[in-house]
């Protein structure tokens, strides 16, 4: 199970990691527009949630942590990658709304809801982007059968890394089925 405190601390840690790796992420930004600002925009977006998350009490629920992060990211979103990141978190938070803690099934559902919401919100979703990385990680999470959160995160990280390595080659995504807009 993940508590609100654990989720809060994980998001803060992730924000710090993105900001520490900002230049490296900027260099990865080659498709569809090689403008070299993905790390900067994601760092600013996720970083916008840190102060509000730090203000949460250690007894916060997982739903409160997710909602706080998503709301702050939406307000602080910068650039396409930042907006998409905030949309992923918005869907993630909706799936955790009202939950005190989250188990593997809750996290898988939250990842799926985040991807679904982001694809629906983007007018022309392009494969080989942050959307693809999130979708592939979510699909692998749903299929892996993990029983514990650490095992689930290992699958998510491995799948995300593999999808990221494939992003410069959009042809590798031609066989994939895109989520449909409702």
What are these regions (language model features)?
Residues 1-29:
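N-terminal amphipathic/basic leader segments beginning at the initiator methionine
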Residues 89-93, 97:
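Hydrophobic or amphipathic alpha-helical targeting/insertion segments
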Residues 101-142:
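A structural-propensity feature for long, helix-poor, extended segments
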Residues 175-182:
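Single conserved hydrophobic/aromatic residue that forms the stacking wall/gate
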Residues 24-33, 58-62, 121-130, 146-153, ...:
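Flexible, glycine/charged-enriched surface loops at secondary-structure junctions
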Residues 4, 21, 51-73, 101, ...:
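Transmembrane helical cores of multi-pass ion-transport proteins
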Residues 20-25, 29-31, 38-53, 66:
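N-terminal cofactor/phosphate-binding cores enriched in small/glycine residues
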Residues 33-40, 73-84, 176:
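Glycine/serine-rich anion-binding loops at beta->alpha junctions
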């Amino acid at each position: 199970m993940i508590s609100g405190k654990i989720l809060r601390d994980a998001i803060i840690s992730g924000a710090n990691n993105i900001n520490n790796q900002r230049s490296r992420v900027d260099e990865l930004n080659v498709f569809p527009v090689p403008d070299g600002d993905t790390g900067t925009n994601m760092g600013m977006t996720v970083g916008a949630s840190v102060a509000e998350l730090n203000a949460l009490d250690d007894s916060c629920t997982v739903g409160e942590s997710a909602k706080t992060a998503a709301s702050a990211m939406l307000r602080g979103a910068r650039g396409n990658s930042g907006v998409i990141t905030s949309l992923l978190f918005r869907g993630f938070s909706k799936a955790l709304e009202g939950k005190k803690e989250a188990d593997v099934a809750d996290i898988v559902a939250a990842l799926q809801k985040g991807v679904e919401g982001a694809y629906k919100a983007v007018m022309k979703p392009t494969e080989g982007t942050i959307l693809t990385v999130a979708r592939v990680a979510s699909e692998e999470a749903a299929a892996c059968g993990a029983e514990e959160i650490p095992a689930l995160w290992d699958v998510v990280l491995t799948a995300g890394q593999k999808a990221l390595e494939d992003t410069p080659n959009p042809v590798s995504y031609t066989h994939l089925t895109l989520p449909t807009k409702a």
